[in-house]
């Protein structure tokens, strides 16, 4: 675990969150937004290897190091996909507690083009605060918030598939601002 102090999420953190939310949404086999999700998948930044990086001695990175880095990255991506599938199954069980009126209201906020990204995050946070208290505390508040955040994204995308891109990015930003430490620890504990 990297212990350096940071005031925000790094590209690596954003990549992890993108993979997690994308994997969560992919785990919904009967969703009406699969076409939009496929398009979004092509727009997401992909991990690039350091195959053309020069080393301090002026030589190119060796294949052994490149293969190890790619293997680590692939391993991490597999872990994140597994976590996403697991959280999606939990979300399936939690779905009962989300009233359609909350989803309608949240979808209306995402359709409102005059709202800023911050306004959308605040709207998402307000809905989450309404929901989080209606679930048992045995799962832990951070895990409950993470699942509910992604579940709300899925519900809004099912309600209005055209909103998928906006709700995806707001969800990623919300997680990076509010649940990043929990997410880092979750991924790290699964990697160990």
UniProtKB/Swiss-Prot annotation:
Residue numbers carrying N-acetylmethionine: 1
InterPro entries xref list: Bcl-2-like_sf, BID
GO CC terms of this entry: cytosol; mitochondrial outer membrane; mitochondrion
Domain of life: Eukaryota
Function statement: Induces caspases and apoptosis. Counters the protective effect of BCL2.
Subunit structure: Forms heterodimers either with the pro-apoptotic protein BAX or the anti-apoptotic protein BCL2. Interacts with PLEKHN1.
This protein's name: BH3-interacting domain death agonist
Organism: Sus scrofa (Pig)
Underlying gene: BID
